[in-house]
């Protein structure tokens, strides 16, 4: 029987050398074993025991409604939106060191 040997020697990053790590792995074994999954073929419309049914929604209609809502609110075209002009930076006062409150 032959075994694979894995070794690793890398620095820690703090100036100290890490000790060599040697792991023996038998053929056919992996270091990370995953539990077997239940692969049952379930047809659409069928429910698994203990799980709530999935609610199917009409995607196209929902997306179209969301797009309309976005365009209405993003541009600010509504009658309740008032135009505001940003202040002119030339007339703004700049505080110098020591001015103002501590």
From Swiss-Prot:
Subcellular location: Cytoplasm; Nucleus; Mitochondrion
GO MF term (any one): transcription coactivator activity
Biased composition (Basic residues): 1-10
UniProt family annotation: Belongs to the GAGE family.
Modified residues (Phosphothreonine): 51, 71, 85, 94
Oligomer and partners: Interacts with JUN.
A biological process from GO: intracellular signal transduction
Protein name listed in UniProt: P antigen family member 4
Domain of life the protein comes from: Eukaryota
Gene induction: Up-regulated in response to a variety of stress factors.
Location (main, coarse): cytoplasm
Modification after translation, per record: HIPK1-mediated phosphorylation at Thr-51 leads to the compaction of its intrinsically disordered conformation and is critical for its ability to potentiate the transcriptional activator activity of JUN inspite of a reduced interaction with JUN. CLK2-mediated phosphorylation at multiple Ser and Thr residues attenuates its ability to potentiate JUN transcriptional activator activity.
Function (record text): Intrinsically disordered protein that potentiates the transcriptional activator activity of JUN. Protects cells from stress-induced apoptosis by inhibiting reactive oxygen species (ROS) production and via regulation of the MAPK signaling pathway.
Residues with the Phosphoserine modification: 7, 9, 73, 79
Keywords annotated in UniProt: Activator, Cytoplasm, DNA-binding, Mitochondrion, Nucleus, Phosphoprotein, Transcription, Transcription regulation
Region (Disordered): 1-102
Effect of residue 51 to A: Loss of phosphorylation and its ability to potentiate JUN transcriptional activator activity
Ranges of Basic and acidic residues composition bias in the record: 45-85
Expression tissues: Expressed at basal lvels in the adult normal prostate gland but is highly up-regulated in the fetal prostate and prostate cancer cells. Preferentially expressed in normal male and female reproductive tissues, testis, fallopian tube, uterus, and placenta, as well as in testicular cancer, uterine cancer, cervical cancer and kidney cancer.
Gene Ontology CC: cytoplasm; mitochondrion; nucleus
